């Protein structure tokens, strides 16, 4: 705003000094003509009026009062100054004050680049100054002050058992849920926790600390809250039409491939968590449908409540199919592992492990009554075998075994026959004894017949 001041000669700064003179008689006609023109132009626009009253107008139009023309000029100047001040105040009220104020702010001076700090998803803050390390942990759970409501791309991540890149805070909560017995808690992920406890645990999780002795239902509720408070849902990339047309396992597999890498890894981790809960259904009463039902509303975000409810039902069926597929993959993997172990194991070791209890009856397995019964039968068979060999010794005339050697040494054939592998079972020995008796009787009958024939 330009400031005006009076000089000693009643002039203005920036304008030449003006000395009014009395007009002559020949100029009165011009004065009257100017007054007529003023009256005609007064009804046009206010701009003409302002222009006519500016300090730059001719002195002839304002010299009608003679000696008072100098005072009129000062009044006009003051009016112009007030008019400009009003215009500037109106412009500042319309928001132009920001533009004017920005011109008064200069560029920063004496700036020094101390350090360059970046956040890595796997290593946390990199390049952190040493004076800030006590306040900010180098492996912070998130680049933000909170782990909730933050994108997974700006959080510290780790790898799970399946090789998925998952936020570390989720893996810590999962581990603590398992160690606290959450898989066997009835109604896990379905029972809502206490709000007071949840807020306290939230503050600790924002610092990257999972407290011990936490309520498993509170921890399960925070896992669902993490998915619910994401900026974008895990399944928001998929349209409702795509999820609705997903009816078979093949359709679900093709639909998972369409997800971005970050969302796909988080979904696979979540499906594994749900499958672990379903495996303990006999304790927690949560089957595949129940777990999918409580997780479905947290996987998508929609503004319309009715549309969100309909879409949640479709997402529930999608999650249920993925859970059943995960359980089937686990069963197939376990069966394959058992088959490979059986193929790679030594046959002799396997035979010894299977017959260790039978071959050593003096060390029966007291925890298994079946093996105890087998050991008892083995001892009975051993007694029968001893009686059988005593019968053989008494029947030396039949030539079955030669036990009357002069030096008392046992031959190699006899030593081989006494090996446990070649000892007969009870039923076989009975059959052998009966066949031997029948053969002896048959030979005696043939010998009597032959003796009765007339030679």
Curated annotation (Swiss-Prot):
Residues 43-54 have a biased composition (Low complexity). PROSITE patterns: RHOGAP. Expressed in differentiating xylem cells. SMART domains: PBD, RhoGAP. Residues 153-331 form the Rho-GAP domain. Residues 105-118 form the CRIB domain. Disulfide bonds: none annotated. Residues 24-33, 435-446 have a biased composition (Basic and acidic residues). It holds the Pfam family RhoGAP. The record marks 190 as: Arginine finger. It is a peripheral membrane protein. One of its GO terms (biological process) is plant-type cell wall organization. Acts as a GTPase activator for the Rac-type GTPase by converting it to an inactive GDP-bound state. Involved in secondary wall pattern formation. In association with ROPGEF4, mediates local activation of ARAC10/ROP11 to initiate the distinct pattern of secondary cell walls in xylem cells. This is Rho GTPase-activating protein 3. It comes from Arabidopsis thaliana. The gene is ROPGAP3.
């Amino acid at each position: 705003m330009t400031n005006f001041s009076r000089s000693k000669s009643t002039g203005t700064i920036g304008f030449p000094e003006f000395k009014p003179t009395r007009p002559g008689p020949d100029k009165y006609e011009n004065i009257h003509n100017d007054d007529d023109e003023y009256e005609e132009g007064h009804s046009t626009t206010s701009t003409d009026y302002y222009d006519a009253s500016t300090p730059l107008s001719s002195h002839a139009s304002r010299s009608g009062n003679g000696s008072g023309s100098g005072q009129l000029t000062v009044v006009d100047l003051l009016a112009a100054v007030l008019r400009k001040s009003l215009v500037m105040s109106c412009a500042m009220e319309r928001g132009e004050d920001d533009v004017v104020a920005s011109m008064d702010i200069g560029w920063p001076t004496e700036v020094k680049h101390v350090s360059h700090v970046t956040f890595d998803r796997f290593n946390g803050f990199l390049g952190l100054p040493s004076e800030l390390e006590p306040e900010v942990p180098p492996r912070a759970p998130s680049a933000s002050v909170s782990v909730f409501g933050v994108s997974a791309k700006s959080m510290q991540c780790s790898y799970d058992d399946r090789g998925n890149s998952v936020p570390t805070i989720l893996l810590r909560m999962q581990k603590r849920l398992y160690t606290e017995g959450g898989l066997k808690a009835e109604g896990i992920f379905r029972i809502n926790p206490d709000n007071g406890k949840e807020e306290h645990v939230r503050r600790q999780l924002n610092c990257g600390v999972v407290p011990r002795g936490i309520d498993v239902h509170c921890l399960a509720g925070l896992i669902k809250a993490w998915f619910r408070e994401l900026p974008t849902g895990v399944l928001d990339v998929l349209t409702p039409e795509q999820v609705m047309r997903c009816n078979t396992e093949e359709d679900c597999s093709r639909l998972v491939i369409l997800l971005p890498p970050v969302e796909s890894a988080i979904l696979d981790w979540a499906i594994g968590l749900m499958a672990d809960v379903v495996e303990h259904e006999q304790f927690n009463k949560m089957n595949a449908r129940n777990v999918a039902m409580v997780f479905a509303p947290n996987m998508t975000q929609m503004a319309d409540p009715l549309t969100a409810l309909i879409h949640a039902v479709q997402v529930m069926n999608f999650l249920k199919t993925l859970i059943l597929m995960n359980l089937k993959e686990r069963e197939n993997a376990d069966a394959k592992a058992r088959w490979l172990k059986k193929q790679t194991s030594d046959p002799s070791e396997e035979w010894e492990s299977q017959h260790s209890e039978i071959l050593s009856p003096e060390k029966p397995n007291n925890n298994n009554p079946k093996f105890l019964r087998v050991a008892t039968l083995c001892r009975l068979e051993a007694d029968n075998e001893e009686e059988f060999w005593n019968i053989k010794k008494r029947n030396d005339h039949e030539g079955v075994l030669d036990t009357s050697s002069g030096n008392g040494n046992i031959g190699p054939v006899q030593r081989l026959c006494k090996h446990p592998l070649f000892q007969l079972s009870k039923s076989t020995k009975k059959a052998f004894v009966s066949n031997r008796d029948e053969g002896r009787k048959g030979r005696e009958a043939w010998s009597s017949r032959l003796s009765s024939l007339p030679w």
